[in-house]
A protein has these predicted regions:
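Histidine/acidic residue-rich metal-binding segments in metalloenzymes
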Residues: 1-84, 96-112, 129-132, 169-170
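Short strand-loop junctions, especially beta-strand C-caps/beta-turns
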Residues: 2-4, 88-90, 115-117
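Short, acidic/turn-prone active-site loops that include or flank metal/cofactor-
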Residues: 32, 89-93, 118-120
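Glycine-rich, flexible loop/turn motifs
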Residues: 36, 48, 89-91, 127, ...
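His/Asp/Glu-enriched, well-ordered alpha-helical/loop segment
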Residues: 54-61, 103-170
Length: 170
């Protein structure tokens, strides 16, 4: 499904059921904008991630695309359940969504892969540009010039993406 705000609870329940029956991952855009998170908290009393957790959608086969506006509780839940995050730095900058807390996610043990989101919100589907931006954004947001080294960015764009897709160690 595109995002939690586009799918009601009964449909989410069916998605979870089919994903479990067929051993398929669930991927969705999650906490991409502040407005999305605020709207979800008003509607359900929970963050978008916690709503999906209550519906049984989260776990090792869950892939959260963006995760820009996740809080500490969300990060802890993502890590505890073995969920994956796909960081889309170019898209998040182009759409002024914000900057994902990648270093906090990594420090918590969340598998973070890199993505482009798509041509409409990116203009270029260039994995090297995504690696560069992920590294630079991490440095500027943490104040640590060593944050997300080139080798880490390369791993996020390759092996960590494969891991998120359930391909294991390739």
């Amino acid at each position: 499904p595109h995002a939690p705000y586009t799918v009601g609870d009964p449909t989410w329940a069916k998605i979870v059921m089919f994903a479990r029956q067929l051993d398929l991952p669930i991927q969705t855009h999650l906490a991409e904008t502040r407005d999305e998170v605020a709207t979800e908290r008003t509607a359900s009393g929970a963050s978008p991630l916690m709503r999906l957790d209550q519906l049984g959608a989260t776990g090792p086969g869950f892939i959260a695309i963006h995760a820009v506006h996740v809080d500490a509780a969300d990060i802890a839940a993502l890590a505890a359940q073995g969920c994956h995050v796909v960081h889309c730095p170019t898209s998040n900058m182009k759409l002024a969504s914000g900057i994902a807390p990648v270093t906090a996610l990594l420090a918590a043990g969340v598998n973070v892969a890199l993505g482009s989101d798509g041509a409409a919100s990116n203009n270029r589907l260039d994995v090297f540009a995504e690696m560069r931006l992920a590294s630079l954004l991490s440095k500027v947001t943490t104040g640590d010039a060593a944050s997300i080294a080139a080798a880490t960015a390369l791993r996020m764009a390759t092996l960590d993406g494969a891991r998120a897709l359930g391909l294991g160690e390739v």
